Structures are given as C-alpha cells and as structure tokens.
C-alpha cells in the first residue's frame, strides 16, 4: 500500500482539528490530558447540579403553604414580628423621596 500523499495528510489533520480529534498521534500522557479536556466539565454533569433541590421552587412553595396556614416557619414569623414592632415604634423604612438625602436638599 502506498503512503498517504501530502494533501491527504493535510486534509486528515484539518478534519481532526475541525471535529475535535487529536491531529497528530501523541504519547499516553498527552492522550490522558486530551481525554480529560474532552470530558464534560464537572459543573455540567447531572449528578453535580442535581445534588441539591431547586431552592427557589421550594422557597415559593413553602411561602404559599405558610400563607395558607399549613406550614409554620418560626424564623420568618420572628422576622415579621420584629418588622411589625419596628413599624409601631416609627422606625420603619421611609417612603420613596422621604429619606435622609431628600430632607437635606429642602
């Protein structure tokens, strides 16, 4: 069998570059690096990003259950109570346009 022509070699290298293959044969250490880079990144693997539940969904669902009275979140109850007491003392957030900077200008 005749060796590949120069054109065929160039086309095979170009094809390898286009399709993400190794263009020229290398030793096993380099091939290990190539295989590591060809794998999917750790953050894109399903077992990594599916490890924890979807917190936004759970937070919204628990908020709805709390609103309906089917779930009691003591920490949120405490925060609401503190906010209510703060407002009773007149320490609530000022309305828009009534902050410290707005009163300085007038």
Curated annotation (Swiss-Prot):
Residues 81-106 are annotated as: Disordered. One of its GO terms (biological process) is mitochondrial translation. It holds the Pfam family MRP-S33. Residues 95-106 have a biased composition (Basic and acidic residues). Transmembrane segments: none annotated. The modification N-acetylserine is found at residue 2. Keywords: Acetylation, Mitochondrion, Ribonucleoprotein, Ribosomal protein. Its main location: mitochondrion. It is found in: Mitochondrion. It comes from the Eukaryota. GO terms for cellular component: mitochondrial inner membrane; mitochondrial small ribosomal subunit; mitochondrion. Residues 84-94 have a biased composition (Basic residues). Component of the mitochondrial ribosome small subunit (28S) which comprises a 12S rRNA and about 30 distinct proteins. Belongs to the mitochondrion-specific ribosomal protein mS33 family. This is Small ribosomal subunit protein mS33. It comes from Mus musculus (Mouse).
């Amino acid at each position: 069998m005749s060796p590949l022509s120069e054109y065929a070699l160039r086309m095979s290298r170009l094809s390898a570059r286009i399709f993400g293959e190794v263009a020229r044969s290398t030793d096993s250490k380099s091939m290990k690096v190539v295989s590591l880079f060809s794998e999917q990144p750790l953050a894109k693997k399903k077992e990594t990003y599916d490890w924890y539940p979807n917190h936004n969904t759970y937070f919204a669902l628990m908020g709805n259950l709390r609103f309906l009275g089917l779930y009691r979140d003591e920490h949120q109850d405490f925060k609401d109570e503190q906010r209510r007491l703060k407002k009773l003392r007149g320490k609530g957030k000022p309305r828009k346009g009534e902050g410290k900077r707005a009163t300085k200008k007038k």
